[in-house]
Amino acid sequence: TGYQTISRRESASAISIVKAKDIMVQGVGSIDQMLQGRIPGMMVLNTSGEPSATPKIRIRGNATINGNKSPVWVVDVPFTASDINSEDAEYLIGNAIAGLNPQDIETITVLKDASATAICGVKGANGVIVITTKKGVVGRPVISYNGNLTLNTRPSYKNYHRMNSQERVLFSRQLIESNMNFGRVPTGETYEAAYEQLMSKQISQAEFEQKVETLQRRNTDWFDLLFRSDVTHTHALNVSGGTEAVKYYVSAGYSNIEGAARGSDSEKFSALAKVDVEYNEYLGFTAKIDYATTSNTGYSSVVNPFDYAYSTARTMPAYNEDGSYYMSYRAAGSTGRDYIGYTILKELNNT
């Protein structure tokens, strides 16, 4: 419970216990993501595409409307609260729990109801997740290594029902021929914009037809520009052993995770040293030192590559003929000032 150990027979509280080896998923580098779908009554919500983003975890729904809704995490004992429960933006990407090496975890206990979390006080109102790390085993030193390599393919238009350039131009032509009313005529490299230029005599019929032909042939692959087939590799090495009186466990872990979106990467290193000393059946102590460092690169939370690739018309170019970024502009607003040009490629490269 974070304070004491109680057998399942002696507890009437709502508690779920899982072993780390039973939920280990190759290619997933954090234990909070591995818990998804494994604990009854627990929801794990991934709110970001960043490779090391912290999922939102809810146990038996929300216990408050405006306050913090996240459970308290406890790593071994004694009970200590963690700042990862903060909703501040600085805790959005990466946290102390995500820094744990999953290979170092023995069991995970989830305390759900009031009787189970009462010992933690008001901080346990949203549930408590207790993580017990591995200990040394009696015997000669045992060295273990675990490593894996995972390859994920990028999303593509084959997986989604989106119009290609020719279909988009045909759809726009049908809307105009049906006299549909546009709240705002699309600007930039669109059929509607070219048609408006033709009607206002800014371009000739031949120039209009040339623009339409160019639009139909463009077929910009936004998924290819913004995403990649990502590679993840993780490594874990540990040594354990000892006697009945003194047991030790030492480990080191490394992971390199490429995000599906270009420019989003996470590199993590962790280390753990743990010594258990037992004088007799009544007296003993545990000394533990752990260390973790994470280096993340990514994009701003207001930039969503998937939404952009999914929603942007394929008639829109990514680059101008001179190789510079193509900037899209909206029509002038009521102030008469034009909006600043935008392209997600520039946003990703300068975030």
Where is each model-derived feature located?
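Acidic/polar loop-and-plug regions of large Gram-negative outer-membrane beta-barrel proteins
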Residues: 292, 297-351
